[in-house]
Amino acid sequence: MSNMMKALVKSKPEVGLWMENVPVPEVGPNDVLIRVRKSAICGTDVHIWNWDQWAQKTIPVPMVVGHEFSGEIAEIGSAVTRYHVGERVSGEGHIVCGKCRNCRAGRGHLCRNTLGVGVNRPGSFGEFVCIPESNVVAIPEDISDEIAAIFDPFGNAVHTALSFDLVGEDVLVTGAGPIGIMGALVAKRSGARKVVITDINPHRLALARKLGIDHVVDASSENLADVMKSIGMTEGFDVGLEMSGAAPAFRDMIDKMNNGGKIAILGIAPAGFEIDWNKVIFKMLNLKGIYGREMFETWYKMIAFVQGGLDLAPIITHRIGIDEFRDGFEAMRSGNSGKVVMDWM
């Protein structure tokens, strides 16, 4: 195996990524080197491409980015015992310290010292990626490489949706991006009574309809209260999944929640936006922030969903070779795409 590889690198502090030849990551005793087959583009990667304020404060330059992937094991460290060369895998993109109070209590997703693959350390937009053995997840043979490559965002959706009991509940999802749509699918499959999803992007609304979400609402032209009445809802929503990061959508969600309703919040909203806290108080709402995936309970659950028949393939709207990466990022930046999966083989 050559000691050099192709990779997409944030090599300059400006807009874009660049395909370069870089050294293959070194494998430590507890590490696993994975030959990447498929990579998916995340909204985080778009922020890095755009070199916005968050990226400028967060991303070291130069660095290989990307964190959504699937592949096969190319090499294992001397202390690795659970995996073997050739095994099909994906990986948890949050690397935790294992030493803080939350880690020691089995709550790794709450680690205060989390390092993000492709954010704080070299990522998966390359022919190889190296992660600790503890972050590797084996992929069953009946799950394809492209579906395994979107397990990271699917895990966000599963973690958010399953934060509260959904059986028999009326669920509002704000934001029909890929994670929002997947969250709505999980809610529907988990026994929710009514599932309503809102957005203002026509492409995303059409994608939500294509994937079988029962009630898809264009918030730019439809009144949510009227929709609720038309589908037989006489009270507010029991569970809200806030996926949009849009202040108007969040405020509308709070308005439409039933007393005692529960809201799981994944969307990252603008700093300093206002909500009516009196409504939160007098409705006795339960707000819960969500970040990443529970390690590794969420992974077990999402594998079970897919093996149980949940079809995520339609959420992938663009399948391209890695040399077409610019087209993939343009599709993501336009907002007129679902997931974009790039092929490294």
From Swiss-Prot:
Record organism: Rhizobium leguminosarum bv. trifolii (strain WSM2304)
Gene: tdh
Cofactor note (record): Binds 2 Zn(2+) ions per subunit.
Name assigned to this protein: L-threonine 3-dehydrogenase
Functional note: Catalyzes the NAD(+)-dependent oxidation of L-threonine to 2-amino-3-ketobutyrate.
Catalytic reaction annotation: L-threonine + NAD(+) = (2S)-2-amino-3-oxobutanoate + NADH + H(+)
Principal subcellular localization: cytoplasm
Site feature: Important for catalytic activity for the proton relay mechanism but does not participate directly in the coordination of zinc atom: D152
Subunit structure comment from the entry: Homotetramer.
Residues noted as binding NAD(+) in the record, renumbered to the chain: I179, D199, R204, L266, G267, I268, I290, Y291
Localization, UniProt: Cytoplasm
Domain of life: Bacteria
GO biological process, one term: L-threonine catabolic process to glycine
GO cellular component: cytoplasm
GO MF annotation list: L-threonine 3-dehydrogenase activity; zinc ion binding
Keyword annotations: Cytoplasm, Metal-binding, NAD, Oxidoreductase, Zinc
